[in-house]
Amino acid sequence: VPARFEPNTTETIDLPKTDRMVIMRRLLNDLLIAQDYVGWPNENSFTKSTERVSQTFTKGLRARIALFAAGYSQHPDGIRYNTEDATERQELYTIAKNECLDIISKGYNTLGTFEANFKALCAEGTIAGAESIFEIPFSASRGRVIYTWGVKHEKKDQWTKLAKGGIN
């Protein structure tokens, strides 16, 4: 995938494939910067919902990307480390560990039972501070997850009153 970090110009319209580590390093740096612009869950009016990005989300995503970048992946020449530099791999593991420890030590998110988490998800509960740290928000007719991944139906359903998950 060609990574575009600047607007297209006639010279950059046809970029070659970008190395995945270039993309992951950029994402790690961007997420580090983003942490200064978002609050912790329930810290302000913007982070009271799991449908808004919080510091827990940015740190969690940063940890996940760091783990992926430090590990093995399928490459055109076979399965190998994403980075051959052992020092960089250790730095990436340290980033993941520190971000996770920061989330845990702050205590803004609590872990409940599986049942409580499942019921909150089914009830479309979006209150921040529980196990779920981020959920993609859908408006009334845009939540086509069940249409895409669920059972197809031709008739209007009882919940959205739309046929085919809203694609008519």
Q: Which stretches of residues belong to each language-model region?
A:
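Generic alpha-helix detector with strongest preference for long hydrophobic helices that associate
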Residues: 8, 43-44, 84, 154
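A short, flexible beta-alpha/helix-coil linker loop
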Residues: 8-9, 73
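Short, well-ordered helical secondary-structure segments
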Residues: 7, 45-47, 121
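Second-shell loop/turn segments in exported
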Residues: 10-18, 49, 81-89
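Aromatic-lined, polymer-binding surfaces characteristic
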Residues: 1-7, 49-57
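Conserved, well-structured interaction surfaces
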Residues: 1-2, 11-25, 29-47
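Short, hydrophobic secondary-structure boundary micro-motifs
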Residues: 2-4, 43-46, 75, 111-114
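An aromatic- and glycine-enriched ligand-binding surface/loop that stacks and positions planar moieties
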Residues: 24, 32, 52-168
